[in-house]
């Protein structure tokens, strides 16, 4: 993120000069209308009043809160018209693709434009005959220097339609008019405009006023399915609460789940200060999709603490004009991924077997990936602008050089949780660590204006809080040096053993050709990304090469490969014939290895005895804490 832009944003919020106070009393006005929503565009008119003399620099955002890459939202803007307060046309200059510089105004600048949107998710804009699904950076222009000003947003439904509005924006006396105290809050306020099903529930955490939770559900299901979903969401909310001990004081006392489950929606979840966007092409009626949908609910709701209020300095304040880089996403995103796994199990949605399989997936992804030798978890986090829904058309080496900070962070969270429980005989856990981060950074950070976090953290804070919690600065220092800023992984087998669980090879003694994907393309079975040092890599195969024969057997499908490998033990050298994408035929041998992937199972299922202490530690880790 641009250092100057961040410093300016902080200065604008914390040091209001007299002229700025005057400007703050002239809110930026937006009128958002949907004349022909079936054509996938909407009309926006924005009025900047009391504009200082000189050029007004109007921008379309390039990035969006909760995302870290550039998305260049100006690409969908068209038919831009600019006038002054008396209606005189003005011709803006275009210093770049996402900026309009307006001169010659009379203190008022009115910009109108159309913006296209046809992607229902947490990042973009979607307009059709059923709704307007707005992510504000993809929808609304803003002006440099006016960021501290309040905003007034009016929504105008399509002619003849009665559309409603669900948003974290502050309500007014009109159901179609809302406000935001500043640009940061406005851009962080996704909005659903249309006909949706609304469910609400209220929970008192005993620490302040009761908080109201709203579910604005746009789906093609029944009211009964909506009721069941609302009940599941409430269960997740109640299961999450004990981890932190209290809810954030949501602005306005309300938190909103903006949920779009539609055949044309894209799978996504996006956190915001007092709301979240949930989208999927899956249907609530489909039991096979329930776990994934509820896992996203748990993940995004947890972000209301971890990322929205416990916030890294790398993304606070958020820079809408550049990519946002943070070295702490292993914590912000990864620990959240670990906890969404734990919450859905504690809440009763995922079985023990499914949960242990999910945890094993974290461990396998990190311990077996060659990427761990090239970068640390901190460095993987810094790569987010390249991989977080970022768009590129050239091939990369990510399959061999990158591990998602979601996955690696979840594995780190797992290791730290079990380590704390091990060292303290179950009296201290990662729940306590999150609660400490909440009380030392989240709660103090809420003293700023809505949309601003006053006490973001850095790496030194994360390590310092671990030292404080554990009472052992050397433990915290070593943990960070080895597992976060180094390339090591915790001793998961020993840690699981303390919980009465066994981590073992899933296919011990079985031959293994590696994890390169096999796909049928261009008339043959071809390999995808070949992991460094895997059997096929050692044999000289690379992406796009075609398998012809293995052990003398014609390869016609991936099942053929599995059948051949299943007949041999690790160490067997099989004849291999393949054709490089250049057309060269290669005859060689490939040596099978033992499948290194692990699984995690209860010790009692292996015939081993489980001690009372192990059972107690396991129960303390996995049992529900749900507030009734």
What is the role of each PLM region?
Residues 7-19:
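Bacterial N-terminal signal peptides
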Residues 19-26:
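Boundary at the C-terminal end of the N-terminal hydrophobic targeting segment
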Residues 34-35, 66-128:
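A surface-exposed beta-strand-loop module
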Residues 42-74, 138-158:
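Surface-exposed beta-strand/loop patches in extracellular or lumenal glycoproteins
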Residues 73-81, 116, 148-166, 179-185, ...:
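Zn2+-dependent metallopeptidase catalytic core
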Residues 112-196:
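Extended, low-hydrophobicity, Ser/Thr/Pro/Gly-biased non-transmembrane segments
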Residues 201-329:
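Juxtacatalytic substrate-recognition/specificity segment
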Residues 340, 350-628:
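C-terminal recognition in membrane/secretory proteostasis and scaffolding
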């Amino acid at each position: 993120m641009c250092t100057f832009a961040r410093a300016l944003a902080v200065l604008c919020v914390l040091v209001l000069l007299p002229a700025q106070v005057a400007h703050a009393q002239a809110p930026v006005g937006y009128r958002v209308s949907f004349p022909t929503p079936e054509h996938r565009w909407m009309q926006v008119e924005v009025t900047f009043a009391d504009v200082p003399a000189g050029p007004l620099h109007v921008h379309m955002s390039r990035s969006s809160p909760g995302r870290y890459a550039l998305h260049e939202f100006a690409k969908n803007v068209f038919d831009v018209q600019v006038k002054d307060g008396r209606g005189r046309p003005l011709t803006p200059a275009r210093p770049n693709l996402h900026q309009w510089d307006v001169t010659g105004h009379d203190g008022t600048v009115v910009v109108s434009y159309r913006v296209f949107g046809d992607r229902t998710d947490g990042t973009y804009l979607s307009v059709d005959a059923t709704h307007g699904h707005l992510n504000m950076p993809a929808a609304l222009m803003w002006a440099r220097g006016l960021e501290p000003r309040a905003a007034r947003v009016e929504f105008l439904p399509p002619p003849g339609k009665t559309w409603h509005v669900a948003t974290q924006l502050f309500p007014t006396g009109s159901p179609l008019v809302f406000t935001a105290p500043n640009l940061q809050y406005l851009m962080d306020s996704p909005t659903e405009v249309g006909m949706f099903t609304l469910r609400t529930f209220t929970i008192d955490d005993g620490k302040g006023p009761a908080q109201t939770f709203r579910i604005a559900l746009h789906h093609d299901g029944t009211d009964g399915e909506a009721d069941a979903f609302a009940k599941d969401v409430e269960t997740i909310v109640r299961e999450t609460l004990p981890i932190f001990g209290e809810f954030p004081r949501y602005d306005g006392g309300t938190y909103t789940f903006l949920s779009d489950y539609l055949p044309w929606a894209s799978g996504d979840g996006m956190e915001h200060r007092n709301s979240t966007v949930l989208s999927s092409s899956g249907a609530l009626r489909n039991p096979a999709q329930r776990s994934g949908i509820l896992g996203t609910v748990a993940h995004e709701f947890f972000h209301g603490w971890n990322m929205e209020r416990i916030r890294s300095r790398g993304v606070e304040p958020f820079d809408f004009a550049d990519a946002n880089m943070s070295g702490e996403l292993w914590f912000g995103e990864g620990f959240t991924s670990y906890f969404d796994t734990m919450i859905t199990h504690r809440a009763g949605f995922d079985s023990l077997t499914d949960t242990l399989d999910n945890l094993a997936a974290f461990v396998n992804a990190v311990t077996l990936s060659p990427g761990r030798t090239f970068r640390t978890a901190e460095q993987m986090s810094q790569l987010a602008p390249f991989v977080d829904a970022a768009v590129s058309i050239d091939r990369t080496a990510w399959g061999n050089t990158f591990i998602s900070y979601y996955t690696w962070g979840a594995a780190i969270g797992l290791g730290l949780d079990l380590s704390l429980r091990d060292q303290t005989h179950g009296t201290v856990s990662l729940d306590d660590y999150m609660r400490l981060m909440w009380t030392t950074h989240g709660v103090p950070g809420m003293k700023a204006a809505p949309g601003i976090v006053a006490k973001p953290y850095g790496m030194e804070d994360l390590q310092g809080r671990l030292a404080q919690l554990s009472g052992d600065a050397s433990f915290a220092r070593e943990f960070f040096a080895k597992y976060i800023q180094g390339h090591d992984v915790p001793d998961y087998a020993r840690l699981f053993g303390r919980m009465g669980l066994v981590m073992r090879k899933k296919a011990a003694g079985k031959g293994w050709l590696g994890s390169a994907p096999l796909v049928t393309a261009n008339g043959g079975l071809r390999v995808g990304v070949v992991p460094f040092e895997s059997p096929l890599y050692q044999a000289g195969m690379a992406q796009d090469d075609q398998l012809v024969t293995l052990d003398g057997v014609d390869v016609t499908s991936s099942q053929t490969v599995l059948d051949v490998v299943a007949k041999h033990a690790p160490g067997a050298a099989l004849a291999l014939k393949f054709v490089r994408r250049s057309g060269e035929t290669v005859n060689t041998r490939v040596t099978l290895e033992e499948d290194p992937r692990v699984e995690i199972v209860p010790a009692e299922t292996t015939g081993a005895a489980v001690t009372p202490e192990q059972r107690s530690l396991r129960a303390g880790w996995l049992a529900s804490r749900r507030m009734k």
